[in-house]
C-alpha cells in the first residue's frame, strides 16, 4: 500500500542457504493468513537466535582520524565537542576508543563504551552529535554493514607476515609498544596466530599501524559450531533420568503392534493424521520410537513435539538411547549457540530427528516423514504471546504440506481432535490397556463436606491415613495441588481488605521462601506490610493454600518423610513466573526415580509424562477452584489434568491408588475420573458444547484490547465489535465487548470481543474488519484465532 509504506532500495543480498525452504515458506504464509499475523513476525518466531541477518551501523576511523588519535597535539584540526563552541584536540576519547577497537565500533555500543571515560560523549544523544561533527571533519566515516548472522560465528586473529617480505626495521625506533606487540604475535604458532581479543586494549591499538606496515595480517575465522549439546542437550542429569542405553526394545503389546502396523503402512503414501489414544502407561512412546525408526530406515526425517521439553527429560533420554546422535533437541533452556548448532545440523542433514517444544514445529528437518505431537491436548501448545499459533495445528498442516504422517498422542485427547476423528479427518487408534500387567489405579473420591480436612485445612482423614500407610510401606506418594506459593490471599481480619497487585486486578500471593508478596501475572514483588494498608491495624492474615504451604505442612505432619516440591518456583522460575529450567528440576526427577523422595508435592509439572515406578499413591488436594473458572473448557481441563496425574500411580511393580478430595463429588469431571471414563465424559461434554455453540462445533476468534485508559479501551472495543458485525452480518455471532475476567494486568485495562461462526471465511473477514479500526493512543489490539483461554 503506497499510501502507508515507502519502499526502500535493496542494499545487499545475504549469501548462503535460505533459513526456510519453499515448503516451510508456504506453511508460514498459511499460518500468517490463518492467525492474522505479520509474516515477518511468524518467521522470526520460527528462527533460533543467531539465524537472522541484520544491518549494523558502523563508525570507522579514517586515515586522518587515526593520525589524530595517535598524535592529539600534532597540528590536527580542532572541532567543537560540546556543540556550543568549546574546542579540544581531535584526539578525544571517541577516536581513541575506535583506535583501540581496531578501527571500528558499532554505533549502538559507542555511548556505553564511553560511559566510563567521561566527557560530553557519554550519552547516546551526545555521542550521536559528536559522531556527526567528527564525520564532517573527515575523521570518521559511518556506514551500514550487512552481517549474516546465519553464517558461523567468527573470531579475529592476527598472524605475522612472512619474515622475508618485510622487516621490523620499518618501524620507527621509538615505536617500542608496536615492537612488543609484533614480538608477541610472532611468538604465536604460525598456523594459528593470536586471537585479537586476547590482546589488551593498548596492544590492540597498535594493530592498525602494524597491518599498514605489512608486518601482520588480521583475519576473521569461522568458529566451528560446537557439537556439545548434540549428545547432551537436555543436561547430564536429564539424560541420566531417562536414558536406558543398551536396553533392548520391549516386545509390543497387541494394541501397540496394531498401531505400529497401521502407521508404518501409511508412511510414504502421502499425508495422513492418526489420533493415538492410549491410557496412561499404555506405551505410546514405544509406538513413536518404532514408527520413527522405520521412517529413518527409509531415509525420512522425524519431528517430535512435546508440551514443554524441560518437563520431559525422560522422553529425550529414551530417544537418545534408541537413536544416539541422530537426535537434535531444540530446547529453550539451551545456550543460544547450542540451539543454533542443533538447528544447523538438522538443516545440513547431519541429524534426522528433532525433538522440541512448540516452536520446534519450524525445525528444518529434511525429507520429513513422520511428525509426532505428544500430549496433543496440552494447552501449552498454544502460543499466548506474539503470534498466537497452535503448535499442534501447525504440525498437522506441516505434515499435510510435506506429504508426511502426523501422530497425535494423548490419554485424554482434546475434544477438537476427538471430533476430527469422528468426522474421519483423523484415523483413530486405541491403546486401551497399560503396557505392563498393572491396570489403571482405582480412584477414590473423598467428599470434604462429610470428611472435612484437619485443622490445617490440608488432608482429610482418609488421605492422611493413606499417606501414613504408604510411608510405612516404604512407597512413594505424589500430592497434587495446582497452585504455587504459600498463601493465595493476604486478608485483613479487621476491615476485610485483600492485598492486591497495584498493577493487576488480582490478589498477591505470599511466598514464604522469599518472604515476599508476588503477583503471578506481572511479577511485581512487595514486602509483607506489618499493618493493613487501609485500616492500619495489625490484623493481616495469610489464607488459602499453595504448594509451598502444603510442603511445609507435610513436613510438620510427617517429620521423618523425605519431602520435595516441584513447581515453577523450585524449577527456577523468575518473579513473573516464566521458568528458567535448570538443574533442580532434573535433580528432583533423578531423586524420585532413585527412591530418594518419599512425598513429592507439586503442581501440573508432576503430571507431564513422568514415569515414576515407585509411586503407589496420588492425592489430589483441591481441584474445585479449577472447575468453576469462567471458561467453557474448564471441565475438560480438570478431567484431563486429574486423569493425567492419576496415571502417575501404579506404573511399577506394585499397584497404585488415587484419592481425590473435593467439595463437588458430583461434578461431571470428578464422576468420570472415578472410573477413568473418558468416553462417557466426552459424549456428555460434546453434547453440551453442541447445544451452546462452542468449539469443536463452531470456530472462534477473540479480539483482545488493552491500554492504560479504561474508557478509551472500552470505546475502541465497541468500535471493533461494530466493525466486525458490519462485515460478518448474521453469519457471525458476537459476544461483548466486555471486560476480561481479569480486567487489569500490568496497569492496563483489558476488554474482549468474542466472534463465533460455523464458517471460517466470514469469521476471518469479521476479525480483520474489527482489528483494522483506528485505536486510541497506547491501545493495543491482538487477534487470537482459536483461543484456548478466556482469561
Can you annotate each of these PLM segments?
Residues 1-410, 417, 422-438, 471-472, ...:
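Accessory, non-ATPase domains that flank or precede helicase/AAA+ motor cores in DNA-metabolism machines
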Residues 248-253, 257-261, 269-714, 718, ...:
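Inter-lobe coupling/hinge segments of SF2-like helicase ATPases
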Residues 731-737:
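A short linear hydrophobic-aromatic micro-motif
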Amino acid at each position: 500500500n503506497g499510501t502507508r509504506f515507502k519502499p526502500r532500495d535493496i542494499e545487499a543480498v545475504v549469501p548462503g542457504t535460505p533459513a526456510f525452504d519453499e515448503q516451510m515458506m508456504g506453511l508460514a504464509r498459511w499460518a500468517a493468513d490463518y492467525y492474522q499475523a505479520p509474516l515477518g513476525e511468524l518467521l522470526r518466531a520460527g528462527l533460533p537466535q543467531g539465524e537472522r541477518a541484520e544491518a549494523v551501523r558502523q563508525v570507522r576511523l579514517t586515515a586522518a582520524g587515526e593520525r589524530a588519535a595517535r598524535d592529539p597535539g600534532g597540528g590536527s584540526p580542532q572541532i567543537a565537542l560540546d556543540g556550543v563552541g568549546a574546542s579540544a584536540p581531535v584526539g578525544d576519547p571517541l577516536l581513541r576508543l575506535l583506535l583501540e577497537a581496531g578501527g571500528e565500533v558499532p554505533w549502538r555500543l559507542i555511548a556505553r563504551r564511553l560511559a566510563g571515560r567521561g566527557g560530553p560523549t557519554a550519552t547516546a544523544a551526545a555521542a550521536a552529535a559528536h559522531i556527526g561533527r567528527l564525520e564532517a571533519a573527515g575523521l570518521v566515516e559511518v556506514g551500514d554493514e550487512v552481517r549474516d548472522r546465519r553464517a558461523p560465528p567468527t573470531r579475529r586473529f592476527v598472524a605475522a607476515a612472512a619474515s622475508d617480505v618485510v622487516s621490523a626495521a620499518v618501524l620507527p625506533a621509538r615505536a617500542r609498544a608496536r615492537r612488543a606487540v609484533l614480538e608477541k604475535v610472532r611468538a604465536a604458532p604460525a598456523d594459528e596466530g593470536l586471537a585479537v581479543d586476547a590482546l589488551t586494549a593498548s596492544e590492540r591499538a597498535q594493530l592498525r599501524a602494524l597491518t599498514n606496515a605489512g608486518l601482520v595480517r588480521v583475519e576473521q575465522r569461522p568458529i566451528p559450531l560446537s557439537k556439545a549439546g548434540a549428545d547432551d542437550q537436555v543436561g547430564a542429569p536429564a539424560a541420566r533420568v531417562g536414558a536406558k542405553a543398551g536396553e533392548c526394545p520391549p516386545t509390543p503389546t497387541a494394541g501397540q503392534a496394531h498401531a505400529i502396523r497401521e502407521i508404518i503402512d501409511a508412511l510414504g503414501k502421502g499425508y495422513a493424521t492418526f489420533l493415538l489414544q492410549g491410557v496412561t502407561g499404555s506405551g505410546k512412546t514405544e509406538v513413536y520410537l518404532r514408527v520413527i525408526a522405520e521412517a529413518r530406515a527409509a531415509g525420512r526425517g522425524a519431528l517430535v513435539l512435546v508440551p514443554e521439553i524441560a518437563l520431559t527429560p525422560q522422553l529425550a533420554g529414551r530417544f537418545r538411547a534408541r537413536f544416539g546422535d541422530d537426535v537434535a533437541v531444540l530446547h529453550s533452556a539451551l545456550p543460544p549457540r547450542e540451539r543454533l548448532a542443533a538447528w544447523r545440523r538438522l538443516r545440513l542433514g547431519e541429524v534426522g530427528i528433532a525433538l522440541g517444544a512448540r516452536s520446534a514445529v519450524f525445525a528444518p528437518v529434511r525429507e520429513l516423514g513422520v511428525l509426532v505431537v505428544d500430549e496433543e491436548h496440552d494447552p501449552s501448545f498454544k502460543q499466548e504471546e506474539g503470534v498466537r499459533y497452535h503448535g499442534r495445528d501447525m504440525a498437522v498442516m506441516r505434515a499435510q504440506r510435506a506429504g508426511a504422517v502426523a501422530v497425535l498422542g494423548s490419554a485424554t485427547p482434546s475434544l477438537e481432535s476427538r471430533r476430527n476423528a469422528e468426522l474421519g479427518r483423523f484415523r483413530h487408534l486405541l491403546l486401551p490397556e497399560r503396557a505392563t500387567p498393572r491396570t489403571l489405579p482405582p480412584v477414590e473420591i473423598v467428599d470434604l463436606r462429610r470428611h472435612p480436612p484437619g485443622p490445617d485445612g490440608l488432608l482429610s482423614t482418609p488421605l492422611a491415613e493413606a499417606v501414613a500407610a504408604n510411608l510405612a510401606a516404604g512407597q512413594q506418594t505424589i500430592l497434587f495441588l495446582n497452585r504455587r506459593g504459600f498463601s493465595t490471599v493476604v486478608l485483613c481480619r479487621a476491615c476485610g481488605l485483600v492485598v492486591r497487585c497495584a498493577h493487576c486486578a488480582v490478589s498477591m500471593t505470599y511466598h514464604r521462601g522469599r518472604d515476599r508478596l508476588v503477583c503471578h501475572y506481572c511479577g511485581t514483588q512487595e514486602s509483607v506490610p506489618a499493618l493493613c494498608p487501609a485500616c492500619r491495624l495489625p490484623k493481616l492474615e495469610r489464607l488459602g493454600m499453595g504448594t509451598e504451604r502444603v510442603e511445609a505442612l507435610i513436613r510438620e505432619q510427617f517429620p521423618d518423610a523425605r519431602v520435595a516440591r516441584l513447581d515453577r518456583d523450585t524449577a527456577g522460575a523468575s518473579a513473573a513466573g516464566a521458568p528458567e529450567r535448570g538443574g533442580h528440576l532434573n535433580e528432583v526427577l533423578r531423586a524420585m526415580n532413585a527412591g530418594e523422595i518419599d512425598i513429592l508435592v507439586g503442581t501440573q509439572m508432576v503430571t507431564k509424562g513422568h514415569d515414576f515406578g515407585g509411586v503407589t499413591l496420588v492425592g489430589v488436594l483441591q481441584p474445585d477452584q479449577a472447575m468453576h473458572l469462567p471458561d467453557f473448557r474448564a471441565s475438560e481441563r480438570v478431567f484431563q489434568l486429574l486423569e493425567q496425574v492419576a496415571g502417575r500411580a501404579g506404573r511399577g511393580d506394585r499397584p497404585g491408588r488415587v484419592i481425590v478430595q473435593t467439595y463437588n463429588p458430583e461434578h461431571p469431571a470428578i464422576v468420570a475420573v472415578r472410573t477413568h471414563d473418558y468416553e462417557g465424559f466426552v459424549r456428555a461434554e460434546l453434547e453440551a458444547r453442541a447445544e451452546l455453540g462452542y468449539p469443536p462445533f463452531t470456530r472462534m476468534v477473540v479480539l483482545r484490547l488493552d491500554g492504560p485508559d479504561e474508557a478509551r479501551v472500552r470505546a475502541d472495543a465497541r468500535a471493533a465489535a461494530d466493525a466486525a458485525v458490519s462485515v460478518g452480518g448474521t453469519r457471525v455471532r458476537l459476544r461483548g465487548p466486555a471486560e476480561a475476567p481479569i480486567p487489569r494486568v500490568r496497569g492496563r485495562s483489558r476488554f474482549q470481543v468474542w466472534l463465533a461462526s460455523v464458517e471460517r471465511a466470514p469469521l476471518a473477514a469479521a476479525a480483520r474488519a474489527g482489528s483494522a479500526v483506528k485505536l486510541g493512543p497506547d491501545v493495543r489490539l491482538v487477534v487470537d484465532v482459536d483461543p484456548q483461554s478466556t482469561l
